[in-house]
């Protein structure tokens, strides 16, 4: 069996725990939000080592602030994290200095508009009855406006490639929306089938195909968005296992879906819409978030590991979270980075 490299992220002294300060890394960085530990781990994608752990309590946020999702500027200059329980979206620079924040009730998923000065924010899955609105944040000022979407629990969220538009979908009903906030345009789309509970989208590199995962249905739903305000369901595929946060390969030929209750990642061919491979092992326990390197070689998948199935947990301690570094050429977990408890959203710059 191929040996898996395990890189211990410090819960002790080898990794700096910082509220701010220079990361001092020239290459790409990967960010992992630890929802039960009020921290964000910063990982050097080149060395696959933790270079900083941002302790949010040192910045005045509560121990139960629940950092959930991370979005990173395309050039890596700033990154954003949603705090479910503290009702905040935070903005950090590359050196992990907190440079802005805005209040938003129970924030969940984040998505950066690649053209405009906008960050979109949806509602957390933990929110039972949040406002039927998404947030539209001006990134430079961190000012926010809320936009009605007219359905309950808007969670899945993805900005369009051409800018000015965002797609969102409901946890509570089979409904999604295409929204152009600046134009005050909103188109609602009803999706057939039993309750899907849409967790998150992935958008193809050419911007023509939007893919959603249904927690309750276990289905992958493929929408044609060539008519951008009228997503059309073209195909569905049952994979089970609670499909979570997906990501496309840069060439568009593959989409990777963490399967949270199957401890696996489904590798789906986008030409045939069939499962090509299933990745298991390493620290893929309750896999949650995902990101991919700009060249498509490395896939980063977080593992909540709340069951403690991976690693050794001292008596009375909380199990560690994980970031799994997957070699997309071999389809194997090449390394596991230990991070604080309940590793959730993953963010990386996309060029």
Model-based region annotation:
Residues 1-8:
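Bacterial N-terminal signal peptides that target proteins for export
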Residues 8-16:
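Bacterial N-terminal signal peptides
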Residues 13, 21-351:
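Predominantly soluble domains enriched in secretory-pathway, periplasmic, or organellar proteins
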């Amino acid at each position: 069996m191929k040996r898996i490299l395990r890189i211990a992220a410090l819960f002790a002294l080898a990794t700096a725990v910082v509220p701010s300060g220079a990361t001092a890394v020239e290459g790409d960085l990967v960010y992992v939000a630890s929802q039960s530990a009020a921290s964000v781990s910063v990982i050097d994608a080149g060395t696959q080592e933790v270079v900083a752990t941002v302790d949010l309590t040192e910045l005045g946020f509560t121990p139960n602030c629940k950092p959930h999702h991370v979005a990173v500027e395309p050039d890596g200059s700033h990154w954003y994290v949603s705090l479910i329980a503290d009702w905040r979206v935070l903005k950090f620079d590359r050196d992990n200095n907190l440079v802005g924040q805005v209040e938003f009730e129970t924030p969940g998923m984040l998505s950066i508009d690649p053209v405009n000065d906008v960050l979109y924010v949806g509602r957390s899955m933990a929110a039972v009855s949040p406002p039927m609105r998404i947030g539209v944040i001006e990134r430079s000022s961190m000012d926010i406006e809320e936009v009605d979407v007219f359905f309950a629990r808007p969670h899945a969220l993805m900005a369009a490639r051409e800018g000015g538009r965002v797609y969102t979908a409901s946890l509570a009903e089979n409904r999604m929306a295409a929204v152009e906030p600046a134009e005050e345009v909103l188109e609602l789309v009803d999706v057939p089938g039993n309750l899907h509970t849409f967790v998150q989208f992935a958008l193809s590199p050419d911007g023509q195909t939007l893919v959603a995962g249904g927690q309750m249905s276990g289905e992958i739903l493929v929408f044609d968005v060539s008519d951008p305000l009228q997503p059309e369901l073209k195909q569905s595929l049952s994979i089970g296992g609670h499909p979570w946060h997906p990501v496309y390969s840069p060439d568009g030929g593959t989409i990777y879906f963490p399967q949270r209750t199957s401890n696996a990642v489904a590798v789906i061919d986008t030409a045939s819409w069939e499962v090509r491979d299933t990745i298991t092992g390493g620290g893929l326990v309750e896999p949650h978030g995902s990101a991919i390197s700009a060249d498509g070689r490395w896939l980063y998948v977080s593992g909540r590991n709340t069951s403690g199935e991976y690693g050794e947990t001292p008596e009375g301690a909380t199990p560690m979270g994980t970031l799994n570094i997957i070699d997309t050429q071999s389809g194997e977990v090449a390394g596991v980075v230990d991070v604080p408890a309940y590793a959730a959203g993953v963010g990386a710059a996309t060029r």
